Every structure is written in structure tokens, then in C-alpha cells.
């Protein structure tokens, strides 16, 4: 009688173990249960999806902050000589918007731009007899403090002559990117 009892006990334990395993592994655990996303970010399968203007594992970082500050520009355009001058990037109206003062060492009015993650976009805009547009990106992760570098690709077109001055925006003209150092 001991052998059949032992066999029933083992079969019962095996059935209970199998049932527990099925229940345990078939449960969909909420991967977002312990995740808190800042700045109206939304957790999706354990990963925060950030609102525009924010980044980081928990959407805790304002994207444009790495661009804000004073920069030294080093550049040579397709029709201008090498130049060095200061610019300043300041926050603007929305969480993604910025304004750039002393852009091109020419403009009296600020140039408008916006930031998405590590890229600064200058949308096409016309002011002071010129059309300007471009993009720039951070080349270092160390830009929240004192140091950082932006490689800026942009173009300035004189509206009177329609002659462009290119700074790495179009590859075929062999122009060089403008380098902005903090």
C-alpha cells in the first residue's frame, strides 16, 4: 500500500506544481506598476514615453537645457572668411522653443529655433534681408555643465542677391559645419 500512496502523492504534487506554474507564468505582470514618468510622460511596457520637450529614462530632463547658454562660434562659410564670435541661446515661449542672439554675427533680432532631444532646428525664416535655416546637434553628453559642442549645419541666403553662404548644410559645396563651443 505504501507504493500506491507514494505514487498518488507524487502525482498530486506534480499536478499542484504544474497548476501553480501555469498560473504564475500566464499572469501578465504590469511592467509600469513601479515606473513613475515625470512631466506628463506615459509608461508603455515599462518604458516612459516622453512628451515633446522632455527626455531621460523617466522624462525628467528638459531637452533644451543642454543648448541654453553662451557659446563661442568658429566657422567659415562658402563666401565668408573664417570667423569667431559669441552667441547666446535662451529659452523661448514653449518647452521646446529657443531664441539665438547674435546669430551669424549679423542679426540684430533673435533667430527662432526649437529643440527635439539632441538636435537644434532653425526653421526657414526671413529677417533683416536674409533667409536662414539649419540644424545642429550636440556632439557630447557633457553639455549640462560648463562645456559642450554643437555642430551646426545652416545656410544664410541674401534676399537681394540670392547668393547663399553655406555652413555644412549642403554637402556638394564642400562647406564646413559651424562649431559652437560652450
Can you say where each PLM-predicted feature lies in the sequence?
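Tryptophan-anchored aromatic micro-motifs
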Residues: 64-83, 100
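Short domain-boundary/entry signatures in modular proteins, especially
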Residues: 28-32, 59-69
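Disulfide-braced loops of extracellular cysteine-rich modules
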Residues: 31-40
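Sec-dependent bacterial lipoprotein signal peptides
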Residues: 1-27
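Short helix-loop boundary/capping segments
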Residues: 79-93, 97-108
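Beta-sheet ligand-binding and adhesion/scaffold domains
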Residues: 77, 114-182
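Extracellular cysteine-rich, disulfide-stabilized repeat modules
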Residues: 41-52
Amino acid at each position: 500500500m505504501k507504493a500506491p500512496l507514494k505514487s498518488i502523492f507524487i502525482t498530486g504534487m506534480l499536478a499542484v506544481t504544474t497548476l501553480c506554474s501555469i498560473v504564475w507564468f500566464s499572469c501578465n505582470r504590469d511592467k509600469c506598476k513601479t515606473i513613475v514618468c515625470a512631466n506628463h510622460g506615459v509608461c508603455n511596457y515599462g518604458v516612459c514615453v516622453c512628451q515633446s520637450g522632455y527626455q531621460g529614462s523617466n522624462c525628467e530632463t528638459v531637452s533644451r537645457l543642454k543648448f541654453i547658454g553662451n557659446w563661442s562660434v568658429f566657422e567659415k562659410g562658402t563666401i565668408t572668411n573664417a570667423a569667431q564670435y559669441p552667441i547666446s541661446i535662451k529659452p523661448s515661449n514653449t518647452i521646446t522653443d529657443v531664441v539665438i542672439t547674435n546669430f551669424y554675427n549679423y542679426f540684430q533680432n533673435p533667430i527662432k529655433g526649437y529643440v527635439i532631444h539632441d538636435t537644434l532646428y532653425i526653421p526657414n525664416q526671413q529677417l533683416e534681408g536674409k533667409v536662414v535655416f539649419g540644424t545642429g546637434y550636440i556632439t557630447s553628453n557633457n553639455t549640462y555643465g560648463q562645456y559642450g559642442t554643437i555642430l551646426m549645419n545652416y545656410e544664410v541666403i541674401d534676399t537681394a542677391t540670392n547668393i547663399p553662404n553655406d555652413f555644412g548644410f549642403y554637402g556638394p559645396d564642400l562647406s564646413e559645419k559651424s562649431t559652437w563651443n560652450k
